[in-house]
Structure formats: structure tokens, C-alpha cells
């Protein structure tokens, strides 16, 4: 295993963070011919958000910027098993966005128009179609539902295993439990990193450390928008098949799907201040249970198997921070990911191309690291997350 190998004295590119973002980037860099790629992670295998997410793959949102980016990522998910040579277990079961309020129905009307503009295959379901797609849903509560047939789910454990195997087969050196303790600069640009007393030279560094993104940016001496935030999820005991597609209950800030084993997995967001903890709590559990019970009454008898929390890095507009850092040549960032599992294939591909060629793809450009300094946030009204007050 690469983790048993000694650290090199230098690397062509160092990636800090070996979650799905870091591994996707490493794989794509290797596909572009980059050698001597080093990936360092302070935690254990699948110990971060890449091992603690809801596994949903959503291929479109309500803004053109998010839709174009995540539609590309969804398309890449569909061919990812063949490309990696490992089964990522992507299931194209669809994704249904459900609205209860009239204002949410209007949002879904506008969302459909965005999808048509972007060439996305989606449709507003009639009451009859919705009963076919989600027969167990409390239809009397629904004002509108928009369905994305090409979206679905992909278990994080399968995707992470596939990316890691593909990276190591291409010679990428991956080291877990290897925290970076300092970031060096030389002549006004990135010069390398330090792991304890050892210095590893490199003129290209990528910060893909999830919830530790702000701490890593501080280490590099550069500003970075955003903050770490705890998200929680719940799994119910297995039950008979009730929910076919993945589901977003927009008005309840709740997302969910049913696994092949029959467990309903998902979570609801509640307004809370940013917390750097993995402790699960009762308010989120109660909000999730209420959403399940009211919108899928047949789940009322099901017991909660487990509730867990994961840490992500959230930007001001909830969008990714992706690309070169404007304050330090040689430094790149992949942060701000509240939908990092779904966006990993596109992020890895587009960021790798930007690093190697210097050309920024139009689907990636809106998520530039310095967009807030330029007063150009990306407004996305269709996310299932809560702002804190």
C-alpha cells in the first residue's frame, strides 16, 4: 500500500485532502499525464465527509451556473465505473424535487425553464405521474414536483474505493494519517509543504481538505471564504420498497433515498450556528423524523437505526470554491463543497485541466475563489441547506 511508503523529497503536485475531491483530482491529473502526484490526508481512510454523506447524485439545480456544472458531473458519474475500472455502483433511479408551498411551485416552474435553457432532461410531474413515481408520498401536501430522470445515487464507499484503486494503479502516492504541519513559499509562490520535520518540495499545491479548508488557507497565509459546518443524516431500519427515486423535500430542507437493503437514508437541515463537531443532536433528528412521517406516512412504524454527523466547508453562497487562489501563485483550492460527492467527477476533471493547461472551463468559472471579493456570488435557490442567523 502507498501509505507504507516513505514520503518523497519532492512532488510535481501535492494535494492536501484524500477525500473524493482530492482523489478525483489526482486521477484526472494522472489521466492528463502528470506524474509524481502526492496526496496527503491528516485523517483516516473515508474519515471525513466523503464517508459521511447521503450519496445522492443530483444533476441539476435552479440556477444556470449550478445546473451546467452538476449536469456535467452527473453525466460523468454514468460512465465512471468504466473509466475507473471499478464499480462505483451508480444507480440512475431519478431525483424528484418536491414543493409544498405555492412559492416553491413557482420556483420549480422557473427551474424547469432553466433546465430547458441548459438542455437538461427534466419535467414537472402531473398528479398522476407523481403517483406513479412516488406512490407512498402524501400527495395532498404537494403543490408541485420536478423530476430529473438521469440523476440518482452512488454509495460513497464504492466511489471512494474505485477512485483510490484507480489512483494507485496509476502511481499516485496516497498517505492517510499524514497531517501537513506547514506550507512553504519560495519567491512569492508555493514552494512545498512540511510533514513534521520533513520538507516536500513542490511548486503546485491543492487544498482539498474539506472542513479544514480555512485552517489550511491560514497555514498558507491566504484568505479563504467560508466556515466548517456540521450536517447530519439518519438511517431507518429496512422496510419494503417505498421510495424509488432520490427525493428533495424543498420546503423541509430534507433529502432522502431508499437503499437496496431497504433503509431510508437522509436528513433535514435546521438553522444552527457553524459547529466543528461530529456530535449528532435531537433537533435534527426530530426535524428529519417529522419530515419522513408527514410526507411518507408509511414510515411511521420504522425505527431509527442510527444518526450521524459529518463536517463540510460552506461558502457564503453555498457554492464550491474551485480554481487558482488569486493571492498566491501555485496554490489551487477545492473547497466550499456542500454537494461535494455529487460534484466530484466534474470538479476533478475541470480543475485538473485548469492546473495543467491554465485554461478555465466556462462551467467552472462562476465558482472562482475570489468571486466574493469581486461581488459576484452565485445565487442558487434550489439547495437543501439552511442559512444560520
Where are these regions (language model features)?
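Beta1/beta-strand and adjacent pyrophosphate-binding region of the FAD-binding site
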Residues: 7-21, 38
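Short hydrophobic core segments
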Residues: 14-16, 200-212, 348
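Active-site substrate-recognition segment that forms the wall
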Residues: 27-31, 57, 86-91, 184, ...
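Glycine-rich FAD pyrophosphate-binding loop
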Residues: 30-50
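Dinucleotide-binding Rossmann-like beta1-alpha1 core, especially the glycine-rich loop
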Residues: 54-133, 283, 291-293
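Short beta-strand to alpha-helix junction loop
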Residues: 68-71, 97-106, 146-165, 279-286
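Helical element adjacent to the flavin cofactor pocket in flavoenzyme catalytic cores
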Residues: 146-203
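C-terminal catalytic lobe of FAD-dependent flavoproteins
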Residues: 296-389
